[in-house]
């Protein structure tokens, strides 16, 4: 299976993708480097597909990957609940392609190519 190493060992890479996936589910739009955005795209697509399936096993698989962070302060909803109750129903008729990666130019400090990844 081909994937980007992102300059990290496997545990750090998995932790990074978990954090970014959780942030994208909560905020629905984040800015990161192009390589991270492209790698994150496949992870988030799989999570949304699990959300669309909606059964207990899918919920547990998503919970094993996504961090338990509060998505909405007022309702107390966490990221997993948001994925299954808000985001997944939105894409019920769509077969994949839930995210969009937009290139935004180089980062000021080190010139790294930046991108915005958002839910369509």
Curated annotation (Swiss-Prot):
Family (UniProt): Belongs to the bacterial ribosomal protein bL17 family.
NCBIfam families for the chain: L17
Name of the featured protein: Large ribosomal subunit protein bL17
Subunit structure: Part of the 50S ribosomal subunit. Contacts protein L32.
Keywords, in A-Z order: Ribonucleoprotein, Ribosomal protein
Upper classification of the organism: Bacteria, Bacillati, Bacillota, Bacilli, Bacillales
GO cellular component, one term: cytosolic large ribosomal subunit
Biological process (GO), any one: translation
This protein's record includes keyword Cytoplasm: no
Entry keyword Ribonucleoprotein: yes
InterPro entries linked to this entry: Ribosomal_bL17, Ribosomal_bL17_CS, Ribosomal_bL17_sf
A GO MF term: structural constituent of ribosome
